[in-house]
Amino acid sequence: MKNPELIIIGAGPGGIAAAVEAARAGVTVKILDENPKPGGRIYGQLNDGFKLLNPGFLGPDYEKGKVLLSEFDTIREKIDYRHDALVFATFENRIMAFHQAGKGQRLPFNKLILATGAYDRPVPFPGWTLPGVLTAGGAQTLVKMQRVLPGKNILFAGSGPLQLVVANQVLDGGGTVAAILEAGEINNWLKLLKGFSRNWGLLTDGLQYVRTIRKAGVPLLRRHMILEAHGDRQVEEAVIAEVDKDWRAIEKTRRILKVDTICLGYGLVPSVELTRLVGCQHRYAADLGGWIPARNEDMETSVPGVFAVGDGAGVAGSAMAMLEGRIAGISTAQSLGYISSEEARKRKKPYLNDMKKMGRLRDALDRISYPRPGLFELAHDDTIICRCEELTLGDIKSAIGKGTTEMNALKRMTRMGMGRCQGRMCAPAVQEIIAGQTQTPAAQIEYLNQRPPTKLVPIKVLESLPGEFEIRHGW
């Protein structure tokens, strides 16, 4: 299948759902995914050599994912599925570049669905670079995929249900959880889920997580946050405190917990590197993770024929990602003439209805758990913000004080975002720092320009790319 009609980047819930709908309609589909197996972060399958003895250990989402993966298997022979294939660039004239097995390849695209997912929000605070501080998502990968505990005495700090999920998996794996700090009001989102109990089974799952945690004797502290981590060569203790409605510490409530691991779960940031590179218009939505591509009801972006689905287009969870993927797959089939507009409307209707119901729930959850200003005020002047270039908050504030109040200008002046992570670990925080220092809404602070490659690739891969490429203006 040299020239597929549709290319899908990402084989998580959104990408797989899109592939299923498009292939069923007759569209020739190629999927490029950087992981060894389909499923993405939520529905990811165990690595070779591991056997799942207790399916319940991976949680209800894993079981839901098996249904989607079974659908995928039924149309697998109709799809050109490439695993371990990393897309790292797009160019003018609708050309993309990816590498697989150490070889660079170029590929023209007509219709494109981007299902690139999201990554854990980085939260700088004193001590966050110590060994033993990791994200809840990273801890979940260790526990789910390798059956390895992230530490011996673990503190969870964040907001929202994800850290409850991971804490349950740690407990099930024999780990010790010192405490769970919920920055928001956990009773609020449990009551909220009760109001939506007819949909998605979220109430049952959430209550079961809380029951397990309380049965294990783990303190579940609402309106609490991590302030600092201390230790010589690794985490040895954490400073925590109660916080107000803006997540600012109530100083008199400070106390110290003896722990060796801190797992942070303050939400996700959409991976928009490829949507930016393609040239899609973006808008800022704090409740959906930050900058996201603007889309219409068909999930199509401002670039004709380019669609975006899942957490990479706004963090809303795996259930929403599947719905968006199905709609994008059907819309693609319609645009290519495989189904009529009437048939497309018929197929999309139940998914659109479910999206509206799910959207109301997500909006309400986001109002409770999205980051408040105090989260971005934890760092001190000597706290490293850009880990790659070892830039501190003081360095960034100094540059801002000299009039450098734009992200790209700050990058040129300080080298912020020029390291291996390409800004993923620092740019979201720097945007909030600029907003706070200049009293400017984050939505008005333009994000970093995107350039290829979007992820690190070996030089030999670039050397092996055939032909020449035209770089889009504005980089």
Segments (PLM) and residue ranges:
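Residues forming the flavin
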Residues: 1-420, 424-475
